[in-house]
Structures are given as structure tokens and as C-alpha cells.
């Protein structure tokens, strides 16, 4: 379970991942824009750059940064890390568990971001959301979650970083809330 220490500094939580991974939809659950389980995926516009919101996270006001996942923005974050990665308390990396063709790109992006976060926010807690584990989704021989973890675990071990992971879906809003400590 995600845990918040008794911190004096404000909490900064970043949600990062490839485009179309579901980051903004997750944030809409956290901010109350989506309160009931939808019957189909909501239609969303891509996040342009960084969108900031404030949520109550473990009874503490928390700044949430939703970093748009389009390639242009990903390159911007990697090129200007001092602008984005200071004072991060929680680093949520969202993986679209159904997007086989983007797995390698997602691994590479995670590695780049992870190295910068370790440099600029070495105490940030790492949380993986394996998103879109929808009711009709059945893990097949591709085993994207296992393949993703197999690729990135050596990086995490080398940096002596522990992590937490959750399977989430917009079709079970509770799964998202649990990942952010809003329900148990």
C-alpha cells in the first residue's frame, strides 16, 4: 500500500507514461470528474504539456502533475529535467497493459525518466499502474506486465529502489482509488 510519511514539505505526485495510457482518465477519477464506472472508455483529448491539479492524498493537499505522453512532450521532459523532476514525493508510471506494440518504447521512456527522478528526487516512491486491465482483458501469451517488469527490474535493483504495483481499470473505479490510497 502507498504510504505517506509525516512530511513538512508539500506533496508532489507525478503521473507519467506513454500517450493514450490512461493517465488523464485516472486523474479524472481522483479529482471526482469521473465518479461512476463508465459503460465505455471516456473520450479524452491528449494532455498538452503538464496539467496540474490538487487532490487530497492521505488527508494532505497534494499537487498532481499529469505529464502529457506525446513524443514532443516526452522529449521536453527528458531535455529539461530540472523543470519537471524536483521535489517529487510519488512517481506513478502508467503502463497500458493492452498496448503490445508500445512496450519497448514504454520501457525505454521509463528508464530515461527513472534515472532523472533518482537524480532530482532520490526519495520519490515508485508506483506502477498496469492500466486497462479491463473486465474483457485476459492476459495472453504476450504477458506484457511480466515482460515490462523483466526489463525494468534490473534498473530498480541497481538503484536499490523498491516499488509498488497495481492493476487498474476505469471499469473498476475502486481499483484506481485503491492505488492512490483513497480506498482500501
Regions of interest found by a model, annotated:
Residues 1-42, 58:
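Conserved G1/Walker A P-loop phosphate-binding module
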Residues 98, 132-135:
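Acidic beta-to-alpha connecting loop that harbors the catalytic carboxylate
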Residues 89-93, 117-132, 157-167:
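Conserved beta-strand/loop subsegment of P-loop NTPase cores
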Residues 59-78:
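Switch II (G3) loop of P-loop NTPases
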Residues 75-100, 116:
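Inter-motif core of Ras-like GTPase G domains
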Residues 100-120, 126:
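Amphipathic helical hotspot of TIR/SEFIR-family domains
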Residues 36-64:
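Conserved substrate/cofactor phosphate-moiety recognition/catalytic segment
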Residues 136-184:
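Canonical P-loop GTPase G-domain recognition
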